[in-house]
Structures are given as C-alpha cells and as structure tokens.
A protein has these predicted regions:
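Basic helix-turn-helix/winged-helix DNA-binding cores
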Residues: 1-87
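Active-site phosphate/pyrophosphate-handling residues
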Residues: 9, 91, 158
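Generic structural signal for hydrophobic core residues of well-folded globular domains
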Residues: 14, 96-100, 163, 167
Length: 177
C-alpha cells in the first residue's frame, strides 16, 4: 500500500475514535507489520502522540491521540491524492475512498476518482494482452501469470466502476454537485 495513503487511513481511523494499533488490526485489517512502522513515522512527524496505558491485564499498551496537525491532515489530506493521480494499489484506492467518504467528500469527486482508477486498470489490462503469446509461445507459466493479471485488473476495473455508479445513485441530488 502507498505509504501516504496508509498514513491518511490511520489518521482518519484515529479521528473516528479508535486508539490502538490493535484496533487498526482488528477493525481495519491493517497488519501490525504495516501499522507499527507507520505509527512511528506519524509520531516522528508530530501527527499523533502515544500515551502509554496499563490495560486490564496489567500490560502496558500504547494508545494514540491525534495532534492538531494530525486532525487537520486526517480531515483534509485526502483531497490532493483524490484529485491527483490514482494510486496503483487496489487496496490504497479503496482506503482512500473510505477516508474521503468519512470526511464527507463530494460524491462527484469520489466517483470521478473511482472512474479514473477504473479507466487506468482497463487500460493496463488492454496493454497487458497485446502480443503476449507471440513473445512467449504457447500458454506457459508466464502467459498464465499474465492472463491472471489481466483478469484481476479487469475485475478491479469493473468493481471500481460499479462502486462509482452506486455512490452516484445513493447520493442525494444536492450532494452530487
């Protein structure tokens, strides 16, 4: 996952009231191997601060609290990536959309971002198909792997397009503008 998107996702998650790395793992599916280094980076950047607490099992655990700068970034940091180029990682795209929705982004902006990500995936899938068999011969390991990648990109593109359509349909008329 893109580091900046992971950082935004973690900040947004803490802005929703969660406090620990364990919460990130349990409720958001972020592994401790990803979240702990990200939390250290966020703490070094003064976006979160750690509060050691003794839990019910008398073990020390770290609760995290957003600083003013962290709260500001959590609520507005998604704008640049959303309006800029789509992150390549499918998980990053979904997490960025989650952050934007939490921050009450305009439906049109989120849907346009999803459409662009879907288009990029379709384009990648098309370019992945051109000439693959001529270069590698009959269907072998490389051709099978490439065919799988093309299928995955097509499925992701379809999902992102359907998600954009769903957002547009659910949004009240005033929020679409």
């Amino acid at each position: 996952m893109n580091r900046s998107v992971l950082n935004l996702f973690i900040l947004s998650f803490f802005d929703r009231g969660f406090e620990t790395a364990y919460d990130l793992q349990r409720h958001a599916g972020v592994s401790l191997g990803s979240s702990l280094p990200a939390l250290r980076r966020l703490e070094a950047a003064s976006l979160v601060k750690s509060k050691p607490q003794v839990g019910s099992s008398k073990r020390l655990r770290h609760e995290f609290e957003l600083t003013a700068a962290g709260r500001k970034l959590a609520r507005g940091g998604w704008i640049a990536p959303l309006k800029g180029q789509s992150p390549g990682n499918f998980d990053s795209i979904l997490r960025l959309v989650d952050v934007a929705q939490h921050c009450q982004a305009k439906v049109a902006d989120v849907a346009a971002f999803l459409d662009a990500a879907s288009s990029a995936r379709r384009s990648s899938a098309r370019s992945g198909r051109t000439g693959s068999r001529e270069k590698r011969g009959p269907l072998g390991i490389m051709a099978t792997r490439e065919a799988w990648s093309v299928s995955r990109l097509q499925a992701e593109a379809g999902f992102l397009a359907a998600l954009a359509k769903s957002l547009r349909q659910k949004a009240p008329r005033s929020a679409k503008r």
